[in-house]
């Protein structure tokens, strides 16, 4: 039994990190402290001053442990790492690590390419961004392709390299074919410079050049050509619209503010890159486990920048705790000075007010949608309960499906709807192991047996404390099982559950002549439901989702089997090396033609691997 009184007495008066655990041994909260003794003792004293969430957390604490560090900065870094590792329930948790996309221009190549990447490497290439809106990045690339002819292939093209036959893009004027030697490195480089200038807001030269060409084509009665230049001008205008300048200092800055109502809070962040608002992001949080606004923003900064690939030069906030400590931590992560500022007036204060206004609007919309969705899903599930005469509302529904093509690569899928909404984290996939050929009944029997056997085993392990609840994949059972098939599949499910001594209601779908669901079968009774009924719409949604999930998995298995690369047969060439070779040379044929020195020029290829490649292709001749 954990002795709280004794443990609180012996905590050292040093900086460090503390971990709160529940009765299952799960880490439910991670915190840092300048003085561990003072901070940890606060949780178990003056509970009236705590928020409701803190009181709930303290009730769940069965034990705690701590790690002493040499400094508060060390404690902050360790706290961030442990929060990432354990994802504790009572910490502010944003989405998974945010790796926003960059536009990468491979200026380290003779003939650069432009594409989207989420990894910023020190490889000599030019990176623009990051951009918070992924769709906007891809749209920007498409617009650039309309304006400038660029190569999109992965060939390793050198200025005086051996020419190859140009691809279709050259013939439809989307590429200038540097692979065939049709353009010099210098001329191609001028195009790249124009692209970089355009993306940096220096678009006057590009616009003037296009206008001159359009007017010239028009005066020569080349109307199609003139229309092409007009379309390019419109594309430039679209790129320009995405880059509204709101600051004259052309620096990278983030603006963070929030708005809260009772326990609900929306934190909003505006991203300013080179003086232009490039996007925004919001996070809906529960503020009740933290203190004042300054404490919340401090935790938000640690959470957000602990998981993002880019940190701006300046971050503006309305208030914050531990400002000097956070600045030092961010500066060490970035490798250069980062400032956190609290503007009281002027342009920066106006932007912060704008961020708060957006946060308020976002929170109001979120709460309204939540209310509408909750009522809709709750009413639908209650109606489903009444139609099937279930004892409980089916808050958790599991649906199953089998997918195969002519008996090959049979797979089973399980999806979960929790309180009317898909719960993707609980989706599971099963590769059929014991059934040969296309036998949906036996395949369904196999996956249901595996699913519920695993569940029973996990429950035993959790009870023995050999397994944490968070580490279990099958221990939560559904309130209702929904089978895509009719009576046959329902009977298979009931047979499996009976053998395992599990009591869960099972219903199936009744199809019409066109294979469309027209109702449900439950307890050997068919229940017809009108197509415009909310229940039928919900069932159709579940059915579509389980089909989508099953087919996606089946397709991935099939592709993995069909797309077997010859590189997989070469000794000393693993997945990482295969990937890098294909990125560098573009195709197996080009790898086959590569010289020993060219192979060695690939990052992960050493002398032994290069020799294996040469020997393999020589022996294959």
Swiss-Prot record:
Residues 204-239 form the UVR domain. This is UvrABC system protein C. CDD domains: GIY-YIG_UvrC_Cho (cd10434). The keyword Cell cycle does not apply. It is found in: Cytoplasm. Belongs to the UvrC family. GO terms for cellular component: cytoplasm; excinuclease repair complex. Its main location: cytoplasm. Gene3D superfamilies: 5' to 3' exonuclease, C-terminal subdomain, GIY-YIG endonuclease, UVR domain, UvrC, RNAse H endonuclease domain. Pfam families: GIY-YIG (PF01541), HHH_2 (PF12826), UVR (PF02151), UvrC_RNaseH (PF22920), UvrC_RNaseH_dom (PF08459). It comes from Clostridium novyi (strain NT). Interacts with UvrB in an incision complex. Residues 13-92 form the GIY-YIG domain. GO terms for molecular function: DNA binding; excinuclease ABC activity. SMART domains: GIYc (SM00465). The keyword Cytoplasm applies. One of its GO terms (biological process) is SOS response. Keywords: Cytoplasm, DNA damage, DNA excision, DNA repair, Excision nuclease, SOS response.
């Amino acid at each position: 039994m954990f002795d709280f009184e004794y443990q609180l007495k012996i905590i050292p008066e040093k900086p460090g990190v503390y971990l709160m655990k529940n009765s299952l041994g799960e880490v439910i909260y991670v915190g840092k402290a300048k003085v561990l003794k003072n901070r940890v003792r606060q949780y178990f004293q003056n509970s009236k001053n705590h928020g409701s969430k803190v009181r709930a957390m303290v009730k769940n604490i069965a034990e705690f442990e701590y790690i002493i560090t040499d400094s508060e900065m060390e404690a902050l870094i360790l706290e961030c790492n442990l929060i990432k590792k354990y994802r504790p329930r009572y910490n502010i948790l944003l989405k998974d690590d945010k790796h926003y996309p960059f536009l990468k221009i491979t200026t380290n190549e003779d003939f650069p390419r432009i594409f989207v990447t989420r990894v910023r490497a020190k490889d000599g290439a030019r990176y623009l961004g990051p951009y918070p809106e992924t769709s906007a990045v891809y749209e920007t690339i498409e617009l650039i392709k309309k304006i400038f002819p660029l190569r999109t292939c992965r060939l390793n093209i050198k200025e005086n390299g051996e020419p190859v036959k140009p691809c279709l893009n050259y013939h439809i004027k989307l590429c200038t074919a540097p692979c065939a030697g049709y353009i010099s490195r210098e001329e191609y480089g001028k195009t790249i410079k124009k692209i970089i200038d355009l993306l940096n807001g220096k678009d006057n030269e590009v616009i003037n050049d296009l206008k001159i060409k359009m007017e010239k084509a028009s005066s020569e009665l080349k109307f199609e050509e003139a229309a092409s230049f007009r379309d390019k001008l419109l594309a430039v205008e679209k790129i320009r619209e995405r880059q509204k300048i709101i600051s004259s200092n052309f620096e990278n800055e983030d603006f963070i503010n929030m708005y809260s109502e009772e326990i609900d809070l929306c934190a909003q962040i505006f991203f300013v890159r080179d003086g232009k608002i490039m996007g925004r992001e919001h996070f809906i949080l529960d503020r009740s486990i933290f203190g004042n606004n300054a404490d919340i923003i401090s935790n938000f900064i640690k959470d957000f920048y602990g998981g993002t690939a880019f940190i701006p030069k300046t971050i503006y906030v309305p208030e914050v705790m531990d400002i000097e400590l956070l600045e030092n931590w961010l500066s060490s992560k970035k490798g250069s000075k980062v400032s956190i500022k609290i503007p009281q007036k002027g342009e920066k204060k106006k932007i912060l007010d704008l961020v708060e206004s957006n946060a308020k609007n976002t929170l109001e919309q979120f709460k309204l949608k939540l209310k509408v969705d909750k009522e809709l899903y709750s009413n639908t599930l209650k109606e489903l309960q009444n139609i099937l005469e279930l004892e409980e509302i089916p808050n958790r529904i599991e649906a199953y499906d089998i997918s195969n093509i002519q008996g090959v690569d049979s797979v089973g899928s399980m999806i979960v709807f929790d309180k009317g909404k898909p719960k993707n984290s609980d989706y599971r996939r099963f590769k059929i192991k014991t059934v040969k050929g296309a036998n949906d009944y036996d395949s369904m029997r196999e996956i249901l047996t595996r699913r519920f056997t695993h569940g029973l085993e996990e429950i035993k392990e959790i009870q023995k404390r050999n397994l944490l609840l968070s580490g279990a994949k099958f221990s939560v059972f559904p309130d209702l099982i929904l089978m895509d098939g009719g009576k046959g599949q329902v009977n298979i499910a009931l047979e499996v559950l009976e053998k395992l001594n599990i009591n869960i209601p099972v219903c199936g779908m009744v199809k019409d002549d066109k294979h469309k669901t027209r109702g449900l079968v439950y307890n050997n009774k068919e229940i017809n439901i009108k197509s415009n009924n909310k229940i039928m719409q919900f069932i159709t949604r579940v059915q579509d989702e389980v089909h989508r999930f099953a087919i996606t998995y089946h397709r991935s298995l099939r592709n993995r089997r069909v797309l077997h690369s010859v590189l997989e047969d070469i000794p000393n060439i693993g997945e990482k090396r295969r990937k890098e070779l294909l990125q560098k040379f573009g195709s197996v044929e080009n790898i086959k033609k590569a010289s020993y020195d060219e192979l060695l020029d690939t990052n992960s290829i050493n002398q032994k691997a290069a020799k294996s490649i040469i020997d393999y292709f020589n022996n294959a001749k």
